[in-house]
């Protein structure tokens, strides 16, 4: 019985120490996983879809490159 209570208390302490990931970081991680964008030259990868890392929209110019719009 004591071991079960100890296990529950330890589990509660571990879960209380884990901080939730902010939504912006989750979005950044998912965009990076899709191929990412190139913020240093304001171009985005064609595989990223309609979004860039900085949440700017992309205007598709060709299959290989697209310019990010403000």
Curated annotation (Swiss-Prot):
Disulfide bond residue pairs: 37-53, 44-58, 52-68
Tissue-specificity statement: Expressed by the venom gland.
Propeptide: 21-34
Signal peptide: 1-20
Record GO cellular component, one term: extracellular region
Subcellular locations according to the entry: Secreted
One Pfam match: Toxin_7
The keyword Transmembrane is annotated on this UniProt entry: no
Modified residues (Leucine amide): 69
Family in the record: Belongs to the neurotoxin 01 (U2-agtx) family.
General function of this protein: Insect active toxin causing rapid but reversible paralysis in crickets. No activity shown in mammals. Does not show effect on mammalian voltage-gated calcium channels.
Name of the protein this chain belongs to: U2-agatoxin-Ao1r
Organism whose genome encodes this protein: Agelena orientalis (Funnel-web spider)
């Amino acid at each position: 019985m004591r071991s079960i209570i100890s296990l529950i208390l330890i589990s509660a302490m571990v879960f209380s120490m884990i901080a939730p990931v902010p939504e912006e970081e989750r979005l950044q991680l998912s965009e990076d996983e899709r191929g990412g964008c190139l913020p240093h030259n304001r171009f985005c990868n064609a595989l990223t879809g309609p979004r860039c890392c900085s949440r700017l929209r992309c205007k598709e110019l060709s299959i290989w490159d697209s310019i990010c719009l403000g």
